[in-house]
Amino acid sequence: MQRRQSSKHSKRPLQVHHSNQTDLSAWRKGGTVDTEKSAQNRQSLSDQKNDNEQDSLEQALSYFEKIQDRVSLKKSEVLQKHLSTMESIALKRGLPPEGFDVLLDVALSGKLADTVNTRLLKSLIPASAIPESSIVSSVSWFCVSKCSSNIQLLFLRWLITMFDFIDHKEQVHALYGIFFSFLNDEKLCPYICHVLYLLTRKENVKPFRVRRLLDLQSKMGMQPHLQALLSLYKLFCPELVSITLPQKMKTYFKNADGPWKAAINAVRQRNQANSTVPQPLLLGTAQPHSRKRKWNTQLIVPASSANAQNLVVGGKMSRADSYSANESFPVEQLRTFPQLLQNIHRLEFPSQMGSVLTNPLLLHYMNCSKDESVYLRLYYWMGQTLQEECTWCVVDNNQYEEEFRGFLETVYKAECFLQEGFPSCEEFLYRSLPLWDGVSCRSQILQLVSWIPLSTFSEMKSQLCDPLAQLFFTSSLYFKCSVLESLKELLQNWLNWHVVQLDSESDSQFSSLNTTLSGLVNGVAELINFVGRISTAALHLEKSHTFLLYFILDFYETVCDIYLKYKLPLLIMPPAGVFYPALLSMDSVNLNQLCYIMYRYRTNLIAAKENEMSKKKIQQFKFSSQTYQEYNQYIIAMVGCLWTSSAFQKDNHPEGIRLDDELLKKTGVREYKNSFNIVYHPALMCYAVDFLQQAWPDDTTFNFNLIKGKKWNWYLRYLYGQGLEGLKLFIESSINRVSKASQSKAEDEDEKV
């Protein structure tokens, strides 16, 4: 009644006197008032419509609650009216929590025909949350089998779909044994297994249950739903499940959300279109929730009904009064890190596991938790959501691309926070990349690629590298650069994981580390070789584009320091198809970057050689002589180009730039031998011109032959002063004369000090 009174008062027009409004300002003011009045009238009509719908909903619920005898749908106009009302309101705005007790009891009690019960179950769309008590009550009706098997099946599908909307689950977990007893029903078995998969905790795994599942498997064969439950049992208690099960994650259960997903989407769309309309229908004290897409709703930590009694409106309550020592601390009240530390033993994860992704404190807690069921719940929910919401894997999902992009961004941020990838994301990428167009959610997909966990490269090659390479070769330059950036981050994440593992491993576990290290070395080597192959091809396709070359060299800047920086016994040189385009690049940034990379290769190889010669450490892995040979070939080519002007004569690499003098003379270039030294090199010629202008301001001939002898050394110092640090490090480390000169200079400075 209060709502109706308020709506009546809101209909009163503003009292504005128009008799004296003769000037323009008064006329404008009157127009503004008319606009406000019109908006207020529309709001009043909306409130009145909302009140009428709420009255209709209350009448419908009251009718269904009082049904005692079987009523025919065709003969009862009242039933038809209230059923239609219930369906229209549910599909439009969702049902309040208090409505589920009534409707579930009616649908499962068998008082009405299956046609009516089916329509009731399909209209059970929550506006906020589903009370746990209504689930317990409905399971009791489910057990007495008053309804048909088809209704039982539909109820299980509804329960699976709405599982994360249940406000609290302790009493539902207590029903584990009851659900388990229905496994013998072949029709219900797949869905019962699905419910059990969602409910299973370690304490639920018992020997008699394992035996029951094994017996069912021997009768029915290797059914996916039975494998799912057995895999979960084996994870919790490996000593109880001795059979071998498929290790690779797969889709164990069929999609059960049928009619409800479409209804949830419809509710979300209408509420977004009518954002100024009052909140969803509320009965009692239920709190309003925005009806977004199912996964989006789950990103908000829900307030559980079990903890609602602890909340005080308009006042404060001490923690000592609010929570006893054995009482769980509601996660929706978790605000600070000290709170997390004080209550970490009393925290309980929310029913909607998706909310963990957006809460840093819960992510911290998840990182500390040893409860495997927590990870399984999150991985299962995430895997299902990614599969169902993927805009290029599911028909008619293109309209939700912006939301899906936001969801992928949320998942990626959670992975960055935890510093590890989610297995469900890896599985999603392996399935979706062959269908991906390289455009939809490009940035987010490539970000997720960078967090794929380390696995055998044979699996990655067919499921990740092959589809990614197809897109790589057929897409734009900028897509190629994005892929290379993603693969560089993937390599860095693998290497960082290795460093963390080294720090955490003790000496006594070195033997077990060797197996892991061998797998890591092989996986990293395969990834580097893969990037080398696609980079070589990309440079041919893009005509050695400077922008592309920068990203390729950026990748090898990580590769060249693997041994010293990441403590991994591996060094792989870039292929000739990358090295020579960088050496002959027109851009000084790329040339400087290559010089720095070769300097770091030298530093790492010298350190590796010293460790091999030293008897203090037993080398489990040794670099092949081919690595040293390839490095030496590249050094000869670089020094021949940049310093001795003899690259065309001394380069001995099979894919190098060695050419006969007769062929070079035919080019018509006079100083072809000097074409790529530090004076004539296309990437450095602009520096040579500037140096000549500063050294000989009156000379306009730009005679590069003047840069020799002492002028050569002056020019070298000039280059160092231009920020070409990579060039400086390379020349001083790889050229004897300059190296000795720099050493003697350093010694002189030390003596002066």
Swiss-Prot record:
Keywords from UniProt, A to Z, are: Centromere, Chromosome, Nucleus
Q: Where is the composition biased (Basic residues)?
A: 1-15
User: Where is it found, in Gene Ontology cellular component terms?
Assistant: inner kinetochore; nucleus
Q: Give the GO biological process terms.
A: CENP-A containing chromatin assembly; mitotic sister chromatid segregation
Compartments, as annotated in UniProt: Nucleus; Chromosome, Centromere
A Pfam family found in this protein is CENP-I
Residue span of region Disordered: 1-54
Main localization is: nucleus
**Assembly, per entry:** Component of the CENPA-HI complex, at least composed of CENPH, CENPI, CENPK, CENPL, CENPM, CENPO and CENPP.
By its UniProt entry, which PANTHER family does this protein fall under?
Answer: CENTROMERE PROTEIN I
The task this protein performs is described as:
Component of the CENPA-HI complex, a centromeric complex involved in assembly of kinetochore proteins, mitotic progression and chromosome segregation. Required for the localization of CENPC but not CENPA to the centromere. It however may be involved in incorporation of newly synthesized CENPA into centromeres via its interaction with the CENPA-NAC complex.
Which family does this protein fall into?
Belongs to the CENP-I/CTF3 family.
Name this protein carries in UniProt = Centromere protein I
Taxonomic source organism: Gallus gallus
What gene name is given for the protein in this entry? CENPI
